[in-house]
Amino acid sequence: MSEEMNDQMLVRRQKLQELYDLGIDPFGSKFDRSGLSSDLKEEWDQYSKEELVEKEADSHVAIAGRLMTKRGKGKAGFAHVQDLAGQIQIYVRKDQVGDDEFDLWKNADLGDIVGVEGVMFKTNTGELSVKAKKFTLLTKSLRPLPDKFHGLQDIEQRYRQRYLDLITNEDSTRTFINRSKIIQEMRNYLNNKGFLEVETPMMHQIAGGAAARPFVTHHNALDATLYMRIAIELHLKRLIVGGLEKVYEIGRVFRNEGVSTRHNPEFTMIELYEAYADYHDIMDLTESMVRHIANEVLGSAKVQYNGETIDLESAWTRLHIVDAVKEATGVDFYEVKSDDEAKALAKEHGIEIKDTMKYGHILNEFFEQKVEETLIQPTFIYGHPTEISPLAKKNPEDPRFTDRFELFIVGREHANAFTELNDPIDQKGRFEAQLVEKAQGNDEAHEMDEDYIEALEYGMPPTGGLGIGIDRLVMLLTDSPSIRDVLLFPYMRQK
């Protein structure tokens, strides 16, 4: 082993050898359960102690799980066995299970995985329990669990050893069960709306579809540089060109950026695209879908986050980005006529900007630095500047802005969507402008994607598209303060 064993570990190794000496497999085999702990409680907790005595002949059950508590001396003892659904008490008596199985019970340690067959009864205190008729060791645990009263206190250890966190922290288990349900309800909602789930490549020849730094890899056989995808977007829009009119993909995306409570280098997104729709339709879909998910998974569209009630049930606010900035700062960007004027306003209001930034970038900085964190209740911010929205369609009434929106809840972006740019000539011009930005030092600017331009030249119908960061949505719906709380195995720095 890579570390010195402590006394408890040595004792468990000795017990392991004793089991082998007795011809007992310490790592067991299949065990047929009659149900989970919750199933037993649902079926039998309704009866009184006396009624369970009368029904004993019909109450034979079989459960399996991990020993979490153990007490008792002499010829009988109690324990709590934990499975996916929770815990249930067991009662083991020597005259019920026999000498050999009672010896197994006496030598069992906390953390061991056991199987119990028996009948249901209630103790004098009214706790529903299983009276063991047969006790089986299924897996010998060679390491002691964290202290049962204090659990796993080191937050970093919880992330590094998620399996221990799940064993000792019921809230963590509930969070990840709900994460699975959230994704399932998202699928159910979209499938019922006629969307088709698809799969597209994770390794791209060009890093496109978002403003982000990619991870770079190399294909040895082809001697080719490839990029882990930073977005799913451009492949899905190729499918819209091909006639798949309503598509979505749920998958991993990779961005070579910082790690924080909101960011992980790999994360899960859903992107969807609907032909013959625009960003207003996608706004309606987003609101309806998130509300549906909350109701189905949590039973309510009013959720608690960090002590605040977030109302997903009422109609969500819709606010143009210029109006949002004006409300917060008094600056009306409709009246700003030049980049120089925008830069002067930024200096006046203490907005940090780069020298290369234009009108649209500066408006966005005003929003991010003065408005974003104030948007606690669900708010659609729409009308983003063209300079920062290279894949979105320009607004026909004011081409400085696009038909795009972002969804903000609890001061964080949760979704990004727009009426897709389907004009190949305009799209090529936008890509060329991005190349200029890249040459000026913007590492997150888009590359030119000639193949995507060619696809657009065959004709893409008017289309609405949406991207949602699933991890942030799960954070919201599970009241989790950090993205690491909703990722089973978040990225951690090497020790």
Curated annotation (Swiss-Prot):
Pfam families: tRNA-synt_2, tRNA_anti-codon. It is an enzyme of class 6 (ligase). Mg(2+) 2 binds at E413. Binds 3 Mg(2+) ions per subunit. The keyword Metal-binding applies. Its main location: cytoplasm. Its cofactor is Mg(2+). GO terms for molecular function: ATP binding; catalytic activity, acting on a protein; lysine-tRNA ligase activity; magnesium ion binding; transferase activity; tRNA binding. One of its GO terms (cellular component) is cytosol. The keyword Secreted does not apply. GO terms for biological process: lysyl-tRNA aminoacylation. It is found in: Cytoplasm. Its EC number is 6.1.1.6. It catalyses: tRNA(Lys) + L-lysine + ATP = L-lysyl-tRNA(Lys) + AMP + diphosphate. Coiled coil: none annotated. Keywords: Aminoacyl-tRNA synthetase, ATP-binding, Cytoplasm, Ligase, Magnesium, Metal-binding, Nucleotide-binding, Protein biosynthesis. Mg(2+) 1 binds at E406, E413. Belongs to the class-II aminoacyl-tRNA synthetase family. Homodimer. HAMAP family: Lys_tRNA_synth_class2. This is Lysine--tRNA ligase. The gene is lysS.
